[in-house]
Structures are given as structure tokens and as C-alpha cells.
């Protein structure tokens, strides 16, 4: 004898069927078409271009205002740097930004292999997020299974912390006992250098072009700098895809 389906089971099945379309919409990755302003945060000068150069060019071509923030640089390892102006790798970053049509959000001033913690780095990133107020933030995936670079892991986690902290009015601490009034909620957090992509970006319209010319002029000026150690890129189009993990993607009702 066939067992009857209980009323409870029927209700659950019906509710699931009705709710599924809405759940699929809510759980879907954010669309790049909704981004008006983006902030790409890289551990080192070149990471954004290598990992997401094509996506950056794609966004810029769509009219998106794209900023770049560099966390680490060679200020302690560039032997030609005298403490003023820009280091070789900072110049490379600025040249890459100009080539791609990005805006510079600054250099945080941490040296390669910094002893600073992810929390300390996050506290420096949070005010910049609040100032720029991006719709989306992109950085390296700190959870990449094969990631062994401590700088990448540390900065990736710092960006995750800052992504959340920017929306809290009590972070980093109250000002004269009062909450912050410049908080900003970011709705999309994207990771490149990822092994779990959920979004593929078609960058075929961007075209292929080399990054090397933007560095060539820099190294001609730096006679003491050995070009064998250049941080130049071989291709500006970067990886043909980027991965996004929606840590916090909400639909506001406008209230």
C-alpha cells in the first residue's frame, strides 16, 4: 500500500517550489552591470593587472569609475629609493593605472613581508573605503588552496575585515564617544587568483595588449636599477575570468 504524503511534507514542497525563484535571485552572484564605482586592492604593484587586468579594462570601458589601492611596496628593498618621491614599483603601479584608465587611491606604505597583522592593515583600508564609497571591492583570494604567499593571504583577509568594518559606526573606535558618520556598506566583494570562480567575464572586446611598454620608460630612467628584477607584466589582459564570493550582497528597499 502506497504511503500517503503528509500535509506537512506537501506544505514544505509547495513552499520550496514557490520560494525557489526568489532564492535563486538572492543567491546569484552580483552583476558587473550594476557597478558604478569599483575599488581594486592589491597586495603588490602588479597583482591587480595580472589577476584582473582584463576585468579592470572591461569595467573602465563600460564607464565604471575604477580605483586602485596598493598595500605593499618596495620602499625597503629598492636600493635606488632615497626616501622621497616614488619607488620603482610605485612608478610601475602609476603607469599601469594610467594605461588602464584607473584612479590612484594611494599606497598604504607597508613594506613587502610586513610584520603588520591583517587587523592592522584592515584599519588602514577602512577609512579609504569610506572615502571612496565603492559599490564593489576586488582583491586576491586569501583562501586559494595553493596560495603560499603570506602577503597575499594577509592582505586578502585584511580586505575582508575592512569590507565589513566600513559599515560599522563603532569601528575602529568611537570618536569622542560618538559613532562614525561616514560609514559605507559595500555590496559586492570579488576575488581574483581564485580556484572557486562563480562568475566568468568575457573580455574579448577588450583586446590584447602588452604591459611591458609602460615599464620600459621607467627602467630607462632608473639606470642603477637592474631590469632583470623588473616587476613588469607579460600581458595586460590578465586572467580571462575572475571569481566573486558575495560576502554581503543585499537588496535595499530604499527606506
Segments from the language model and where they lie:
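Active-site rim/loop-helix segments in enzyme catalytic domains that contact anionic ligands
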Residues: 2-132
